[in-house]
Amino acid sequence: MSMRRIVLALVAIVAFAITGKAQSNSDRLSLGVGCLYQNGLDLTLSYEHEGKYHHAWEFFANGYIKWAECASCKHICPESFWKNYRSYGFGIAYKPCVVRGRNHYGNVRIGASAGSDTRRFLGGIHLGYEHNYVLRGGWQLFCQVKTDLMIKGEDLFRTGIVLGVKLPLN
């Protein structure tokens, strides 16, 4: 009887060891949408590779729209929203973990990007804080406070909040 329990315990340990992982070396696809000061809307699609202790590298594509009030109707109309100022960028960010909890963790986000608006080249330096909430199945919700320094952009500083979801790839 004791030999049977030992074998059963070993099988259970091996099964849990094979299927369980502590969220290291995992890959995620994330989508975030947010509002930035002043009159900006931000959309970010990114691939994130997480290493040990929740430190991560993020490769991202970012789109930005800055809307204005229409001169003729004094409201925000489709013309003044979609065609006022637009930019896009591609970049990389390193995210070291600074806070860890049971089902959440926080990262400082440090990165750089290159892109364009409709007329010229843009460079960007990105700083911020991202807090992640881990759900079942590896899904994550995140809230990101970001500040972007845009070189040669219409607006030098962009700051705001982005909310999003991360989907596991492996």
Which sequence ranges carry the predicted segments?
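Generic structural signal for beta-strand residues in well-ordered domains
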Residues: 15, 24, 48-50, 97-101, ...
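Short coil turns and loop connectors of transmembrane beta-barrels in diderm outer membranes
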Residues: 25-27, 39, 53-55, 100-104, ...
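Short glycine/proline- and aromatic-enriched beta-strand/turn motifs that initiate or cap beta-hairpins
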Residues: 21-67, 166-170
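A broad helix-preferring feature
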Residues: 13-19, 106-108, 130
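Cleavable N-terminal export/targeting peptides
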Residues: 1-26, 169-170
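Outer-membrane beta-barrel translocator/channel fold
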Residues: 58-117, 123, 132-133, 141-168
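Charged helix-capping and loop-helix junction motifs
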Residues: 125-127
